[in-house]
Structures are given as structure tokens and as C-alpha cells.
Amino acid sequence: MKVFILLIVFYSVACNQSASNSGSLQSRVDSLEKKLAHTYKPGFGEFMSNIQIHHAKLWFAGKNQNWELADFEMHEIAETLDAIKEYQTEREESKKVDMLKPSLDAVNDAIQKKDSALFNSSYLLLTNTCNNCHKAVNFGFNVVKVPETPPFSNQAFK
């Protein structure tokens, strides 16, 4: 009988500790959810502006046959597109970014081959694909073009 009473006391204490731990854990979960809800998340336009910069830098790198820099800029564009798909899932536009893949692959192929003529034509294809994507998501007023001047004066593209 003493063993039975000891077991009841033991389980009673253990259950109370478990309930106390559950309350503490729930409080921590609630706190983390609140912090997460107020964490900064870049907007779709910020991602697009980032791509615009790398698109321009890609052009000047390729025009100057700086294939290493062009390759770097391609990776930056790809990373930003991946971030759009990860952080902007609620946006309808996010579902369309994969339409850029064939033109990105064409530019990448030109870079790997170090072929200026192929780079020029594939870059134009990429630019037109950007505009087609903009039209597909009702942002056709946002027209991308081949840049005329480098986006930054403090970077060498040669």
C-alpha cells in the first residue's frame, strides 16, 4: 500500500511539472510567433529592384567580356529569384518567375562559352522575357531595357 501511495504522489508531482512545462513552452511559442509576425520581410518590389541592378551590371560585365563578373551577376539574379519564391509565396507574381529560367540558362551558356555574340542575343532574350513576365502579371507599364550607362560609377566592368 505504501508503494501505491508513493506512486500516486510521484505521478501527481510529475503531472504538475509537465503542465507547468507545457505552459512555459506555450508562452515561448507565443512570444516567438509574435516576433516572427513583426520580422522585416523584403517586399516584392525590393527584390525586383535588386534584380534590376544585377541585370544592368550583367550587361556591362558581358559587354566588357568580364566573364567572371558576368557569372557572379547571374548567380545574384538566381539567388534573388529563389528568395522571391521563398519569401513572397502569397504573391501571384512569384509563380511566374520560373518563366525566366530558359532565358537565364541561355545567358549562362553564353557566359560559360565566353561568346560575346551569343551573350548579346541571349541578354536581349532575357530582357524581353522580363517584359513578357511583367505583362503576364499586369505590370506591363514597367519596361526593362538594355542599359545605356553603368548603374554605378565606382565599379570597373572590364
Regions found by a protein language model. Name each.
Residues 80-97:
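Short, solvent-exposed, charged loop/turn and helix-capping segments
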Residues 1-7:
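Sec-dependent signal peptide recognition
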Residues 144-154:
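Short cysteine/histidine-rich metal-coordination sites, predominantly Zn2+-binding motifs
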Residues 63, 67, 93-96, 100, ...:
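Amphipathic, charged alpha-helical scaffolds that flank and support histidine-based chemistry
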Residues 19-67, 158:
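Immediate post-signal-peptide N-terminus of mature secreted/exported proteins
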Residues 126-137:
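The canonical Cys-X-X-Cys-His
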Residues 11-14:
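C-terminal motif of bacterial Sec signal peptides marking the signal peptidase cleavage site
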